[in-house]
Amino acid sequence: LSFQPGDTIIRAAWRQGIEIPHYCWHPGLSIAANCRMCLVEIKAQRPMMLPILAWDEKKKEYVDAVKPKLQPACQIEVTEGMDVSSTGKQAVEAQAAVQEFLLLNHPVDCPICDQAGECKLQDYWLAHQKKLKRKDTEPVHKPKAVRFGPTIVYDAERCIMCTRGVRFCDEVAKDHVLDMRERGNRNEITLSPGRELDHDYTLMTEHVCPVGALTSKDFRFKARVWFLRSAPGV
């Protein structure tokens, strides 16, 4: 692939029309590298190789070997001669594991979710052979239908903490109105004290959400994406 100086792996692939699975990365935002969905195998570079013991069928014993380290494609810059695989066995297994963790507490309410039909969670679940989660316990419950402003509603249970909305407000709208609180599976997006989401780019904040966590009051429960027609943007 051709690339420009400073391009990361995922951006270089994106320029060529190749999609590496991702949630938190967006071409117009800073790099967060927190979803770990874009893990890829980087080969033929010694610093990227991990020493392991591998079974040798001929010798019938374990021998010293190396395997590619998994690296986030959104964070690693491309170099000449770099050998990258996003579809290798280790990369696909890592992506499937990330997907499983994200779905542990995610409500399976796709039939009523406004993001259904254009949801990355749905797309990647289908891409990873529709694997079921192995943890059979009550999911963590969080606030639902939280009013974030005159036009936006937030569902914390659907949120995958990609921080796209937070970064968009900070970097594009220049309004630090969204933030994160708590940790682990209690993590959620919150409003700054005394504020609400009402800047000039409010609906674009909803648009960059890859799942159905941020929804528009005007659209909510009123239409499905497959009934809509596309039109050129401004």
Annotate each language-model stretch with its function.
Residues 1-7:
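Short, contiguous acidic and Ser/Thr-rich linear segments
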Residues 4, 33, 200:
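Residues that form or flank phosphate/diphosphate-binding pockets in enzymes
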Residues 7-10, 157:
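Residues in well-ordered alpha-helical elements
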Residues 36-233:
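Fe-S ferredoxin-like electron-transfer domains
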